[in-house]
Amino acid sequence: MDYKDYQYSRDAAWRILIDCHTTELPVRALAICQALGIPVRRTSLIDAPEGRSVALNGRPVILLAEWPSPERRRFTLAHELGHIILGHVGRVGLLNREPSPEDDPLEQAANVFASRLLAPACVLWGCNVQSAAEIAQLCGISQTAAQFRWERLQLLYQRGKFLVSPLERQVYAQFRPYIEAHKR
């Protein structure tokens, strides 16, 4: 994924946090879908994919399996929301949720969207998060997803690259009361 595509996905996640007036972790992905008018339908079929975003009668719908852990469902829901927000619905049939260098670019973009929506770096930085375990606990995501986010956050810590974008500063300001209450 090139930086321009990464930026687009990241910024889309920040815009959703801002537009939906999200102010605390864990981010309530289902409430965001409801606020955006995107129905989420659950399936209990054990052999069903974890999630899929589709268009029914010209409107986006997210299909979400009930069998994964709540943390995994949260990430899958945010991932599928990313496909919708980024305009992928109808363009992709892949169902991969575990990030991989071989991922389709649309899957990579949806993963970036989901991780930035559920675990915004500026909020984690503001809370002085120092481990994947802390990310998993604060954000309500799986240890695997938290580890990927922690690895990226460590790079940002090394570079000192926080609050550079006006959108990121807006997200930080919106979460400020939460950050102050959860600073470690």
Model regions: which residues?
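Active-site hotspot residues in diverse enzymes, especially metal/ion-binding acidic/histidine motifs
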Residues: 1-184
